[in-house]
Each structure stands twice: as C-alpha cells, then as structure tokens.
Amino acid sequence: MMRDVFRPTKSAPCSPAKPLGISRTQSESFHAIHKVPVGDSPYVRAKNVQLVEKDPERAIPLFWKAINAGDRVDSALKDMAIVMKQQNRAEEAIEAIKSLRVRCSDQAQESLDNILLDLYKRCGRLDDQIGLLKHKLFLIQKGLAFNGKRTKTARSQGKKFQVSVEQEATRLLGNLGWALMQRDNFVEAEDAYRRALSIAPDNNKMCNLGICLMKQGRIDEAKETLRRVKPAVVDGPRGVDSHLKAYERAQQMLNDLGSEMMRRGGDDKVEQRRLFDAIFGSSSIWQPQPCSEQTVKAKPKPGLSNGDGYGDENVKMSVNPVVVNPLRVDAKPFFSSKLVISNNEKLKRTRSSSQGMGMLSGIGGDHEGETNTSTRRRLSMEKKATECGLPDNKDFEDAIMAAVLGTETKVDKKRLKVFQDITLCLNQSL
C-alpha cells in the first residue's frame, strides 16, 4: 500500500567516473572545446557524431542505443528529441519522450515538459499544449514545481541564469494566453494575460493583451492598455525592444479595424471621420517605444502653447517667452455696415456730394441716446463736410470696392488718398 503512495526518487544514470589524479591531456582539451563528454560510452559516441562529425541523422540511432543501454538516459533523451526537432521529425520526438520519459529521473521531468511544449507548438497541437501548460501551472500552485525549490538554474544562448517560481509562472501564463488566442478563446486568454501581469509587468504580454481585447471588439480598453506599455529594459531576458513585434501586430489590427469601420460608415465623410477618431484617437501610442530610461518631462511655462493644446518643442525654456498681443496688429480700417452694401452691383452707383452727406448722416443716426450737445456738433461736422464735398469720380468708387473686398493693389493708394482728403477736410472743420 505504501509503495503505491510513495515512489522512490530515481537518480540519473551516468557513465563511469574517470579516476582522479590524471592530468588533462590533449584529447580532453579537444572535448572541452567542442563540449563533448570524455569517454567511450554510447552516449559519448552519440554526442561526438552530433557535435564533431556534424551528422545528426546518424546520431539519432546512437542516442537510442545509449537510452537502451541506460547510459545518461536523461541527457540522451533530451538531446535525441532536440536533434529530431531540428530534422523536422517533431512527431517522432513527441512519441519518443512520451514512451521513454518513465526511464528518466524526477529532475529531468520538467525539462522534458519544456521540450514537449516546444514540440507541440511546432506541430500545431494546441490542445496538447494548453493541457500541458495548465498542468505545469497546477504544479506551481501546489508548490511541486522546481522539485520544491524556489529557484532553478536555466540556460539560454549558452548563458546560465536563475529563474524564480514567479518568473516561470508568468512565462507559462503568457504561453497559455498565446495558445488560447490561437484557439479563438479570447476570454480565457485575457484572464491568463491579466494573471501574468498581476505577478510582474511585461511589455510583450501587455501588447498581446491589447490584441486580445481588440479581438473582442473592446477598442477603448485595448488603447488604454497599450498606453501603459513602457520602454523595454536593455538588460532584460528578451533583449532590447522585445515588444516591437507585438506593437506591429497591434498596429496592423487597428488598421484592419479602421478599414472595416470606414467601410461601414458609407460615403458620409463626417461619419467616417468620427469612426476613424474613435479607433485612432491618438496615433502616437501605436509608434514603437524607444529603449530609453524613464524621464520626467518638465512642465511647460505659461504662454508656450501654440494654440493646439500642446507646448512648442522648439522654444528655449531658459529664455523668457515674448507674449504676443493679439491686438497689436496692422488692422485694416473699420467700415460700418451702413456704408457697405452687400450687393456688388449697388456699389457701382455714382456718388455725388449729396449722397456722401446722406452716408455721413446715416452714421450719426445709428447712435441712440446722444445728448443735444453731441447732436448739434455732429450736424455741424456734416454741414462742413458737405461743403468740402466728396470726389465725384471713379477714385471714390474704387476706394469703397477695395475696402469691402480687401484687395491690396494700386487702388489702396487711391483709397488712402481719398480718405486722407476726407480726414483733412473733417479736421479743418473742427
């Protein structure tokens, strides 16, 4: 009964240890350079064929022979599966691991699971991949991962580094989210990504979460999620700007969604613009974030706004800005609406001195509540202006046209001369 509950831990079989006290020979140096173990066992011969002779097809049966002989079974099975994957024999590698992993030690089971996950992904067996990922996450939840330890030593690109249980959990949750998205199960994929991000922030997972939200039609949430993406860390485990590929995917999806919504908007330009703004409200957030340190932007000084709600980047902050007075401009002369007739044909009428008097009297009549003194003064000015008279020729007509249309031609000089004459006449009357 007890034998069924507790299984004794198996240790990894190995080749006979070489005797101590023997100096390193030239052959041993060769094996150290090529990372080939020393000896003449079946596993050593298989590794020599794989790494030195560069013949992976002939190395596969030699690994089989080493496993059957019980020589370094853990390493032989892992190496054989990797070589099979490189030779596009992933299905055979999966069956080999499933049938032979019972011969391996407990310490090798986790590494075999990781190789299986890669093989499942290569073969497109998403259901098997999702099931294995959930099983590994269950082991982490129960505290059975890493053989009960908090960290393990991993190897990537020839370098060793320590991996904690939390880091392994975020990696597995990210892979689970990706596999679920391939199955169009976006609800569970969103949950997996959010659980991973609750453990530790990650740019790549944040971008994939945004894509997952877009797949569900939650555009606003996706945009808000992508706004929180920070620049990549230089010495991160994935290298510089590891999330740029996910950013490109997000941008492509937004373009597709934008085209679809623009198509649904019909020919109405206003509706298309509204849909476009709803999707691409801030185009800057879809640009790849540079790999730089987090810096706090200085608050712009008052008055540096260029009118669009954003500060002017070209203004030197150390120099006091010159406040532009909007009233300090070369304004054109002011003309009352009583003087200007909207119909251009009516502007061509020939004006006499009596008409000029009527126009001037019309100006004075617009102001209500004038005192008797100001009224008498105005009538006196109108009388003397009538005596001076307005020019009864085409100059005055051209001046009025130029004032209405605002054209800057030679007529301006005539207009100025005409109005100078009027002003001079009025000044003399005062």
Curated annotation (Swiss-Prot):
Disulfide bonds: none annotated. Probably involved in the regulation of cell division. Keywords: Cell cycle, Cell division, Coiled coil, Nucleus, Repeat, TPR repeat. Belongs to the MS5 protein family. SMART domains: TPR. It comes from the Eukaryota. This is Protein POLLENLESS 3-LIKE 2. Gene3D superfamilies: Tetratricopeptide repeat domain (1.25.40.10). TPR repeats lie at residues 40-73, 74-107, 110-143, 170-203, 205-236, 238-257. The lineage of its organism: Eukaryota, Viridiplantae, Streptophyta, Embryophyta, Tracheophyta. Residues 1-21, 346-376 are annotated as: Disordered. Residues 81-107 form a coiled coil. It is found in: Nucleus. Its main location: nucleus. One of its GO terms (cellular component) is nucleus. GO terms for biological process: cell division.
